[in-house]
């Protein structure tokens, strides 16, 4: 369970018998989290998304975290994800290039200095457990996408390639069609 600013997150096991406090991030609002096997080693790793508006003067507070699971112990990976300086609202897994590993879609939440202005969202390609943003003219729709509040991976046009539907404040429902990876 992610925590709002001032409260640590809590990790519960599947049956709710054990809980473990996630400390060290109480100054950050954790807006989303997702378990997935980022390095294809058979266990679930954890991506924690940072968001909120409380840290307008501390952009470092918006650094997401990727926790790598090794034999049930999670360690923070310092070098597998890029620097994130804009509050996020959703993190999704998607194998957009159908190469067999899970890539990430990170949505932007707000422009801290201009509420209402559209912000970027990012698609991160998974290369052996490390993530880098996908750039280029085929991904211009992610620039200034909007103040996204929710997103879902779906195959809208039934072409066997995953697309993404997004909704948000002051924006239209938007479909990001995958043009074959």
Go through the PLM ranges and name each one:
Residues 1, 7-28, 65-86, 122-146, ...:
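Blade-edge motifs of beta-propeller repeat domains
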Residues 1-4, 46-50, 104-108, 163-168:
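Hydrophobic beta-strand segments that make up the repeating blades of beta-propeller
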Residues 26-69, 74:
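A generic tandem-repeat structural signature
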Residues 29-40, 80, 87-98, 102, ...:
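Beta-propeller blade termini
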Residues 54-56, 112-113, 139-142:
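Short, small-residue-enriched loops and turns at beta-alpha junctions
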Residues 138-180:
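Beta-propeller domains
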């Amino acid at each position: 369970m992610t925590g709002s600013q001032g409260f640590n997150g809590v990790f519960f096991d599947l049956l709710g018998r054990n809980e473990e406090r996630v400390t060290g991030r109480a100054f950050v609002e954790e807006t989303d989290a997702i378990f997935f096997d980022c390095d294809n080693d058979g266990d679930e790793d954890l991506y924690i998304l940072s968001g909120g508006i409380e840290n307008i003067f501390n952009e470092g507070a918006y650094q997401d975290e990727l926790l790598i699971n090794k034999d049930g112990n999670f360690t923070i990976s310092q070098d597998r994800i890029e620097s994130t300086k804009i509050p996020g609202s959703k993190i999704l897994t998607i194998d957009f290039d159908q190469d067999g590993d899970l890539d990430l879609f990170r949505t932007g939440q707000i422009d801290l200095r201009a509420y209402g202005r559209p912000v970027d969202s990012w698609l991160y390609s998974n290369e052996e457990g490390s993530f880098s943003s996908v750039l280029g003219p085929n991904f211009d729709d992610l620039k200034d996408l909007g103040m996204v509040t929710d997103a879902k991976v779906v195959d809208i046009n039934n072409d066997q390639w995953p697309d993404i539907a997004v909704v948000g404040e002051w924006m239209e429902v938007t479909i990001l069609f995958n043009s074959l990876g």
